Amino acid sequence: MAAAMMNKTIVVSKDGCARSSSIPKVATNKMGFASAVAMKKSREMMVWQPFNNKMFETFSYLPPLTDEQISKQVDYILANSWTPCLEFAASDQAYAGNENCIRMGPVASTYQDNRYWTMWKLPMFGCTDGSQVLSEIQACTKAFPDAYIRLVCFDANRQVQISGFLVHRPPTATDYRLPADRQV
């Protein structure tokens, strides 16, 4: 019993419930040294870099999407009968902050973070051709090359935003880090 308890730890979650979980064991060789797999996993558990490492919605942890990857996402959006919509924001207005958030009393939860981006034209209601969405992305990028541009999609049945991801990041943006540089 005591040996079994040594490999367990008690974790208290945010809801106050205590849960027992196993402590992962490090694989060692005959000499007692950690294996290469264990060393690789220990490098994966590093401290998150809090500076110049901001994220935007879906896929923010990935490198910027290529045109082909954006095209596949657009096809997926249209295949699900969702309504695509383009939005853009200047670099200084793209992230949530006290300067650019609307505060209506102590708590304002009318939108995700009370920060609105400017809509590019109207939502593309009834759009079934992905090339139309891609041409609007190109037009918006041409009109606002120094702005963040994101594609969001809405489900009319559930009346919610389903997804949102960046399709253009300003060339002068310094807030993105490669995945290898996101940890210390």
UniProtKB/Swiss-Prot annotation:
Residues 1-43 form a transit peptide. It is found in: Plastid, Chloroplast. Pfam families: RuBisCO_small (PF00101). It comes from the Eukaryota. InterPro entries: RuBisCO_ssu, RuBisCO_ssu_dom, RuBisCO_ssu_sf. The keyword Glycosyltransferase does not apply. Keywords: Calvin cycle, Carbon dioxide fixation, Chloroplast, Photorespiration, Photosynthesis, Plastid, Transit peptide. GO terms for cellular component: chloroplast. The keyword ATP-binding does not apply. GO terms for biological process: photorespiration; reductive pentose-phosphate cycle. One of its GO terms (molecular function) is ribulose-bisphosphate carboxylase activity. Signal peptide: none annotated. PANTHER family: RIBULOSE BISPHOSPHATE CARBOXYLASE SMALL CHAIN 1, CHLOROPLASTIC, RIBULOSE BISPHOSPHATE CARBOXYLASE SMALL SUBUNIT, CHLOROPLASTIC 1. The basic functional RuBisCO is composed of a large chain homodimer in a 'head-to-tail' conformation. In form I RuBisCO this homodimer is arranged in a barrel-like tetramer with the small subunits forming a tetrameric 'cap' on each end of the 'barrel'. Belongs to the RuBisCO small chain family. Heterohexadecamer of 8 large and 8 small subunits. RuBisCO catalyzes two reactions: the carboxylation of D-ribulose 1,5-bisphosphate, the primary event in carbon dioxide fixation, as well as the oxidative fragmentation of the pentose substrate. Both reactions occur simultaneously and in competition at the same active site. Although the small subunit is not catalytic it is essential for maximal activity. This is Ribulose bisphosphate carboxylase small subunit, chloroplastic 5. The gene is RBCS5.
